[in-house]
């Protein structure tokens, strides 16, 4: 089923300028296409035009044409569009309508008044395709992130749609679960011949399996329409703020000139032999031993255990420490207990057993308010933290709650606005800011209180590479210049690799490892236990025959830090 955009332009009624500008794009029947681009580039708007949300549910002005199999979508209604294009959303919870997996998959069939006997057969067959046939009676809300996504996928597949649209399917998934999701999408594409369109930031993870083309968007326009090899060999990813595969970054760091003929889009097809001398030379010239860490303790966690239901431990006898001035990550798959550690540190939860000390004092003796004087936390979604209309008032709120006089409040807020690059926005309403700017406001709101420890929960969620790099470089400067200790909670292995010195790995409720990042990332068996995966940096070093892969990873980390 062919998709044809011809001189297609779309403008939301609420905006002055078009979000999509003069789009000309053809996607053939059975193609597998990836759409990439920075936040605000128009990727999701393009997807909403395909599935009929625009213009039937989301209003705006359209010009040009969009035809699916020769039919102009203006002649269709929303119901007809959804019978052609099945959409799997980033937030799968918002897509569930059934009390069980089976009911959710059957929802579309019930609307079509399919007889019950046929319905059972179709549901079972569809569930088997996405490996859910053994949990049809389970509530979808009790499943893991990867399982939830498969339920959503099955729910659109029973309609027997011709086009499958995935809107950021990897956004909330840990690396191993993300790879499994890409495997299933690839399996469906090969077995059914359906047209597959994937909108995603995490390009290297999507390229875990082959795709036909990559469409790159910027400011509402298509700036590239290429094969994966053509795009990866170009400099367009870097120019437009899209993270390129790690092994490509490492090859470029070593001065390697990559061409389309090298088949660079997939590590398995890349011609590595020609690059081996340059890689080895770069590695031997670049290696510098790690500097010893500051040994003065800030936070000590001793034998911490916690259970939400009193039966199964979410955390089981976990111990670790964080030194003053460190930049540390807690790494683990979804549901491993990472966020529970944060809640215990902040005092929102009380441990069943164990203790937490800060600067030698037992935090069990401190209230949540007293802990907040020393520890600041920035939540994944800035909208969950913001409580005031104006930027100045939001940042000043914590100081005012402490009874600080207004002259001091004003001085401190102005200082922090300057530090965070927000001074020119001080009189702006928060609603006028971008997502990344809101994130800076939440960090500023915490920093003005002068915490000793700053905790960032999934700081890169919902942000493209360009915007999250800006934010993380700012956080790195806070760590270097002000000496603020930083703790990141994440399953984003690229983030952990680029910015943190040490990783604490949690798996199956227990502490699995506590070591420098380059050591953690050079141990495949350990990563497998944590439901994580080796990075392509490891694969590159291994393919090159480098014995000390941890040192190779350390070289790359140092190179990236110097060139940010």
Swiss-Prot record:
ATP 1 binds at residues 37-44. It comes from the Bacteria. It is an enzyme of class 7 (translocase). Signal peptide: none annotated. ATP 2 binds at residues 332-339. Pfam families: ABC_tran, DUF3744. Residues 3-244, 299-533 form the ABC transporter domain. Its EC number is 7.-.-.-. It is found in: Cell inner membrane. Keywords: ATP-binding, Cell inner membrane, Cell membrane, Membrane, Nucleotide-binding, Repeat, Translocase, Transport. GO terms for molecular function: ATP binding; ATP hydrolysis activity; ATPase-coupled transmembrane transporter activity. GO terms for cellular component: ATP-binding cassette (ABC) transporter complex. Probably part of an ABC transporter complex. Responsible for energy coupling to the transport system. Belongs to the ABC transporter superfamily. This is Putative ABC transporter ATP-binding protein PBPRA2240. It comes from Photobacterium profundum (strain SS9).
